[in-house]
Amino acid sequence: MIDNTWAGGVLFKALEHGIDISIQAGTKYLVGHSDIMIGTAVANTRTWDKLREHSYLMGQMVDADSAYTTARGIRTLGVRLKQHHESSLKVAKWLSEQPQVKAVYHPALPSCPGHENFKRDFTGASGLFSFELHKRLNDEELSAFMDNFELFTMAYSWGGFESLILCNQAEEIAKIRPGIERKLTGSLIRLHIGFEDTDELIADLQAGFDRIK
């Protein structure tokens, strides 16, 4: 089983790669507007009957409005994911050229670990990626950087039309993923690139960097 939310369920063909069950938070890219809570599961013929039986036994169901809204979102999924890919890659390329940035973790960039696997297995990228700063932001710098964006909003969820930002410190990541091979030293910034003008998003990030010089 795999969580296929980052790829919107379509940028990575899970069942074609031998995976039995592909799940995703439809709340994100399937719906596309961050206004419905729904999850989906797709299975191959070998596991579908058992999955469906468990779903019935647990009484899982979704209301009609959520089902309709999700179905409507799926109609524009391909167009939206294409825009997420193009916009996020443009921002990622710009970030990779900034002196404050140590590394950009966007799988479509050749410099990103796992890029070859991405090229082999995926048909595109979504809007979610992260970048690491050369330094660890102290509390004052973190507040100056994160609290004053014009377009980016601090929020955990993603997959909608809006651009979002979060920060995690290296020690926080180490606690969450103690077995990670690539050890972080600087602050890690997570971005979700939505449908705002990319030049304006870049200007917003540049203003953030200017605040921590």
How would you name each of these model-derived features?
Residues 1-100, 105:
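Conserved PLP-enzyme active-site core in the AAT-like
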Residues 32, 64-66, 121-124, 181-186:
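Short, flexible turn/loop "capping" segments at secondary-structure junctions
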Residues 39-41, 129, 165:
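Well-ordered beta-strand positions enriched in small/hydrophobic/aromatic, beta-favoring residues
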Residues 51, 141-145, 201-205:
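Hydrophobic side chains in well-ordered alpha-helices
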Residues 70-79, 126-135, 190-194:
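Short, well-ordered beta-strand elements within core beta-sheets of diverse protein domains
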Residues 89-150, 154-159, 173-180:
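Conserved small-domain helix->loop->beta segment predominantly found in fold-type I
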Residues 135-137, 163-213:
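PLP-dependent enzyme catalytic core of the Aspartate aminotransferase-like
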